[in-house]
Design a protein with these regions (language model features):
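ABC transporter nucleotide-binding domains
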Residues: 2-4, 9-206, 210-211
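Hydrophobic/anchoring residues in structured secondary elements
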Residues: 9, 254-257, 296
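C-terminal coupling/interaction segments
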Residues: 268-341
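ABC transporter nucleotide-binding domain
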Residues: 173-269
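Conserved protein kinase catalytic domain
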Residues: 73, 117, 172, 219, ...
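A generic structural signal for secondary-structure junctions
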Residues: 77, 103, 142, 202, ...
């Protein structure tokens, strides 16, 4: 559905997006995850035709966003980080304007307006001035305009930023509902949000794609999945002697507890936690010692995110680039209004 190849965006010497390549398939919900200033908004603005790349291509259902902008943009509904709303209008007036700008008219426009108003839950406020609406309702109106024109792909940039907890839950539920009939891509830096909604996760850091997979697969791949904590009454030197004889262990650290037990955190070279656990029980038993408790630590999306983004930070040139990246990220997110073919 969407093919991004070798996408790069420079602002002078600063690289906001660095050689991004990925493919988005039909009918799934994708989370675009990264810290502030990572390049998420810049990438989304390029994908939607609001910003030109320095190099690289974006194709929407086979249509190049630069060479065939009208055909490509007809397939996209976009909500920028700052919703492009006209606050002197009512939601109904605003949606009529957007629909006509997208080439939808007459009975079909009214049908689509009725549908998106129902879907986004703004029927009760459709005749109030947008300037009087809460942040949550403004986000809903922004999503409603993205849905006009019957696009196949919905792209949402930080759709829950600035909302209260109830509004966040409502927008998340709306995204799940949209995912039943559309391909949805939304950006966030909130890990729990991405984990609870998305079927696929793209993690971007310093403008580079560092991971792209299902959340569950990412969790399985990273370090904490090979971490085991053992609780025992054996002495620390005895534990060291036992663990040195267990194959497949890379490192361990012992901590004395108030009840006289020893807590031992063990990092394994293999991710086969069952096999490592079996070896540990056997080794302790053979030495006449007992394992009172054994816990396998499973990675979550937060572990994956921190490890990947910290690796990128170590290669960064310094905090000045971070600030510059945020400045360009914010600037690029302001460059787009309503997408009109």
């Amino acid at each position: 559905m969407i093919v991004v190849e070798h996408l790069t965006k420079h602002y002078g010497d600063f690289v906001a997006v660095n050689d991004l390549s990925f493919e988005i398939q039909d009918g799934r919900v994708y989370g675009f995850l990264g810290p502030n200033g990572a390049g998420k908004s810049t990438t989304m603005n390029i994908m939607t035709g609001c910003l030109s790349p320095t190099s690289g291509t974006v194709r929407i259902d086979g249509h190049d966003i630069l060479k065939e902008p009208e055909a490509a943009k007809r397939l996209i509904g976009y909500l920028p980080e700052r919703p492009p709303l006209y606050t002197s209008e009512t939601p109904a007036e605003y949606l009529q304007f957007v629909g006509e700008a997208k080439g939808v008219k007459g009975p079909e426009l009214q049908r689509q307006m009725d549908e998106v108003i129902r879907l986004t839950g703004i029927d009760q406020v459709k005749d109030r001035l947008i300037s009087t609406l809460s942040k949550g309702y403004c986000q809903r109106v922004g999503i409603a305009q993205a849905l006009l024109g019957a696009p196949k792909v919905i792209i949402l940039d930080e759709p829950t930023v600035g909302l209260d907890p109830i509004q966040i839950i409502e927008i998340r539920d709306l995204i799940r509902e949209l995912g039943k009939t559309h391909t949805v891509i939304f950006s966030s830096h909130i890990l729990s949000e991405v984990q609870s909604i998305c079927e696929q996760v793209l993690i971007i850091s310093k403008g580079s794609l560092v991971a792209f997979d299902e959340p569950e697969n990412l969790e399985k791949l990273f370090t904490q999945s090979g971490s085991i904590v053992v609780r025992t009454r054996a002495a620390a030197d005895t534990v060291d002697s036992i663990l040195k004889r267990v194959p497949g262990l890379s490192e361990w650290a012992s901590t004395a507890q108030a009840d006289g037990c020893l807590s031992v955190s063990i990092r394994a070279e293999t991710q086969d936690s069952y096999e490592i656990s079996r070896r540990l029980f056997f080794a302790f038993s053979e030495s006449g010692e007992a394992i009172l408790e054994l816990t396998v630590k499973r990675a979550n999306l937060e572990d994956v995110f921190l490890e990947l983004t910290e690796e990128q930070e170590h290669s960064a040139t310094g905090t000045q680039d971070n600030a510059l990246g945020q400045t360009h990220e914010e600037a690029s997110s302001d460059e787009c209004e309503v997408i009109v073919p």
